[in-house]
Amino acid sequence: MFILVVNCGSSSIKADVIDSISQSTLISFSAERIPAAPVLQLNKNNIAYNGEPTVDAILSVGLLSIKEALNDKVISGIGHRVVHGGSEYSQPVLIDDKVEQAIQNLITLAPLHNPINLIGIQKAKEVFPDIPNVAVFDTAF
């Protein structure tokens, strides 16, 4: 089973496809120095990028690159690091409209991170529409 793990920050993005049986990384995407001078890599190889220096645009490129690199492999689930789950979320949760709205409502508690985390969730749903998404909250630890 292959799991996509997404960690969107205010100045960097990391996304890895993990083989849950061997626990090895199959595909690794990273983007650093957003928005100043983005550097994108897939499996440690630079990706030429001349687009907008936004998390939204860069994440689209990253997730589409991952999808292409998967070839015939199928992702079974997507996990998202989310900074703040408030008092409502103390463990991982399947993301639905209610969870997305809760993350939105908690932006005041994590104004630099929760909006970016939501972009990650929304982009993953666009690129991998039929795959379940799970939020894992920093506040659960």
Can you annotate each of these PLM segments?
Residues 1-4:
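Extreme N-terminal starter segment of soluble prokaryotic enzymes
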Residues 6-11:
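A short acidic Gly-Thr/Ser loop motif
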Residues 12-53:
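Short glycine-rich, Thr/Ser-proximal phosphate-binding strand/loop in the N-terminal lobe
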Residues 19-27, 71-74, 130-131:
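A generic structural motif
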Residues 45-81:
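Glycine-rich, N-terminal phosphate-binding loop and its surrounding beta-alpha-beta segment
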Residues 53-57, 94, 98, 115-119:
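Conserved active-site and cofactor/substrate-binding residues in soluble primary-metabolism enzymes
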Residues 66-113, 134, 140-141:
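Short beta-strand-loop/turn "lid" adjacent to the catalytic site in phosphate-handling enzymes
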Residues 114-115, 121-141:
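Phosphate-binding/catalytic loop of phosphoryl-transfer enzymes
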